[in-house]
Regions:
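A short, surface-exposed helix-loop junction/capping segment
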Residues: 95-98, 297-299, 348
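Short secondary-structure junctions and interdomain/linker hinges
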Residues: 12, 16, 31, 44, ...
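C-terminal helix-loop subdomains that flank or include functional centers
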Residues: 277-278, 282-293, 309, 316-468
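Extended, regular secondary-structure scaffolds
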Residues: 112-120, 125-230
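Extended, helix-rich architectural segments
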Residues: 1-144, 455, 461-468
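Short amphipathic alpha-helical segments
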Residues: 90-94, 103-106, 110, 118, ...
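Extended, charged amphipathic alpha-helical segments
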Residues: 205-343
């Protein structure tokens, strides 16, 4: 997190050139770390640049473990669209314009990209902006886009509230022929957006291009943190990933070297034969060796085989990677043989704890974005929305065991101890139905005389199908 004192902002609430150079310098110092994390995610780990002596096998095997960790953690957190709900008709009327704007800018894709970036880099950044409505240039709506963390950051006040002061996004500018031409910067404050040009990120001179107003009521750049340390999900196991890559690469190198064993001759020598062939040519072409007497011996020099030890170490490393990252190995044979709902939850317990922390920080960003959209909607004349009363729900992307839910509902129905609402919830537990969806289904069942009783519905549905 980059922090500065609010009192050093200018009268417009924007950073001075000196402050801007200072925060850019602090951001640039963190770029090697971000680049390293990106390389691991893309599979470009250090093993790919390993150099060995000439003539030795140099297999370089990089495993996409970082991508696996990010994919599982991101899918579990943001695999399902985020839901927004509020009580009251008037409140819902204030929320509807915002959810409509969310739909137009594919908010679920933005959320997924933010979750992925936070999982890789420890933080994600998005930019809320105004977009012209297609087909009507006189109408605008708010939209949002995810920015690369290597090129964007938010600066916070140095008080205990961590209030955003301004955000910075930059790109490398180019000339007409594509050659580099410095950088363009957009500095977003609470009221203004300032566009600048700078020769390089450490240059002393900053040239202002334009200053425009925005209508979001606060800094229109939102950061999503992965945790309080802004660390990526695989950052703590990088040394284990390196060890795993090295072990597997060396195993392949050893196998390759076995083909080039040294031949040990005892009690005899090999010389050029009558055809002028060197000893190595004789062995390669004839595939045979004639020894002069029974005292002579020939054997290959074998290195000590450590395949069993290597396999034990390999298993220990991969187990430690999953344990320390808290992302389970879903291909574990012990787990694959037991896929009941209870077993699944035990297997995912560590991931659930990790995701709970990730979700708390992600929610902060979602609510900050919602406040920006709510302010913009109010400026456009829509009803005022109390953002604090909006219920934001993130649903886990769990594999569903519909058979268990159906069996549970059948048991409850046979005992006569559960209401229609309870049994509907049981049938659709795997579908993550909301309260409104459950209530609508109950009313449909109870209000339709042609509907069969619950027991008939359960039997007709079959294991794991539920009510359509």
């Amino acid at each position: 997190m980059i922090r500065r004192a609010r009192r050093y902002l200018d009268e417009r609430g924007m950073p001075t050139d000196a402050m801007l150079r200072s925060v850019l310098s602090e951001h640039v110092r963190n770029l090697p770390r971000l680049g390293m994390l990106r390389n691991y995610y893309l599979g470009n780990s250090p093993i790919m640049s390993r150099v060995r002596a000439k003539g030795l096998p140099n297999n370089r095997i990089a495993h996409p473990i970082a991508r696996y960790i990010v994919s599982v953690a991101t899918g579990y957190l943001a695999g399902q669209p985020v839901a927004y709900a509020i009580d009251g008709e008037q409140e819902q009327a204030a929320l509807d314009p915002i959810t409509e704007m969310y739909a137009h800018c594919a908010i679920s894709s933005v959320d997924a990209e933010n979750a992925r970036n936070a999982s890789i880099y420890g933080r994600a950044v998005e930019y809320v902006h105004v977009q012209t409505v297609e087909g009507d240039t006189t109408q605008v709506r708010a939209c949002v886009v995810s920015l690369p963390p290597e090129q964007a950051f938010v600066v916070y006040d140095d008080d205990y509230h961590f209030t955003p002061l301004f955000g910075v996004y930059y790109i490398q500018d180019t000339k007409e022929d594509g050659s580099p031409d410095g950088y363009r910067l957009w500095i977003s404050g609470a009221k203004l957006i300032r566009e600048c040009k700078i020769g390089d990120l450490g240059a002393a001179s900053i040239h202002e291009i334009a200053v425009t107003d925005h209508f979001f009521g606060d800094v229109p750049m939102v950061e999503y943190w992965n945790d309080d340390q802004e660390r990526g999900d695989f950052e703590s196991v990088i040394s284990l990933i390196d060890a795993y890559d090295k072990l597997e690469s060396d195993r392949v190198n050893d196998k390759e070297q076995e083909v080039d064993k040294l031949l040990l001759l005892t009690g005899c020598t090999m010389e050029t034969d009558e055809r002028g062939r060197e000893p190595w040519q004789q062995l390669r072409e004839d595939k045979a060796l004639c020894l002069p007497d029974t005292q002579a011996q020939a054997s290959y020099l074998d290195g000590a085989s450590a395949s069993s030890e290597d396999e034990i170490m390999r298993g220990a490393l991969i187990a430690d990677i999953h344990k320390m990252s808290m992302v389970p190995d879903l291909s574990d044979k012990d787990f694959a043989n037991n896929v009941s709902g209870v077993a699944m939850r035990y297997k995912l317990w560590g991931l659930e704890q990790l995701t709970n922390v990730k979700q708390q920080w992600f929610m902060e960003g979602l609510r900050a974005r919602l406040k920006l959209f709510a302010h913009f909607a109010e400026v456009k004349g829509f009803p005022q929305l109390d953002v604090d009363n909006v219920k934001i729900t993130m649903t886990r992307a769990l594999p569903a065991n519909n058979l268990e839910y159906a069996q549970l509902a059948q048991t409850a129905d046979a005992a006569g101890a559960a209401s229609t609402e309870t049994k509907v919830r049981m049938l659709h537990a795997a579908d993550n139905w909301t309260d409104e969806m459950v209530q609508a289904e109950v009313e449909r069942i109870q209000g339709d005389a042609s509907m069969p009783d619950m027991n008939t519905l359960l039997n007709a549905a079959g294991p794991g199908e539920g009510i359509e």
